[in-house]
Amino acid sequence: MPNVNGVLGPIDTADLGFTLMHEHVMVATPAMRQAFPDWIDRDAVVANATTELRAAMERGVRTMVDLTPINLGRDITVIRDVAERAGTQMIAATGFYWTEEPWFQGWEVDRLVERLLPDITTGIQGTRVRAGIIKAATDHLGVTELNRKLLQVAARLHRATGVPISTHTSVHHHTGLGQQDVFAEEGVDLSRVVIGHCGDTEDVEHLEQILKRGSTIGMDRFGLDFMLPMEKRVSTIAALCKRGWVKQMVLSHDACCHIDWFSKEMVKQLAPRWSFRHIPDDVLPALRADGVSDADIRTMTVDNPRRVFERQGAY
């Protein structure tokens, strides 16, 4: 089997196992960390994330994909330390979030691609840790002129390296379709793209529009019940399985062991089950109760992630 760039070194795709495809060790505002050295307690972040990952591993999770992009505070030294201490397989990302930052304006697409390329080919932040996936993002504003540029960066970086793309979307604004349009214009094979946050809707017909174009969809915000309750997320997956789409879905939480957007108290109040343990503990039993077979669960948690990373080679 081919290898994928892992945080602790190459991972044989045959050994990926149960994979959470969209998670975060830490989201921490880079400018605030630079301005205030005590903005985060790094040791506490690493310790908490290590505990969370070990708990997930005890429940059968073998690999976690950390999709934190550069401008959400990706810190590869934190990710690496957590992987080493937890003893788990992790895959890190390169790429950008959707926020339209002023400095993007003056950079051409190919110049940004050149800047990101070493993250995949050499190492991130002066380390030997190479990115194994490319993050792209489009939110409620849709594919603006600047967002198109960022999607083009992801597309060209993907085509230059063969590393897969995984996205953030606002599914209620149908931004996944807009992402697919830009990727297709750039010559991207849409079957090598994961369109994320599709689990935030019950609109099966809309999701089928994305699926029919070949992409995998991320049913990847389990635990964010205030956005859509678990039961509705589960029933949507069950409906798509019955319609024959099981080979194009992956599962995850989009959980953050540390996020500086909210207080810990607010996270506990709004999303008490938002952790790497929620899918093994609660979601998989609910899927089975809704008629999803163990074979289909394995397809979504093991086989589909493996296929995402097996499709390799520049083109």
Regions of interest found by a model, annotated:
Residues D81-E84, Q89-T161, T216, F222-F226:
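Active-site gating/metal-coordination segments in enzymes
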Residues G17-M26, Q34-Q89, D110-V129:
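Alpha-helical scaffold segments that flank or form the walls of functional sites
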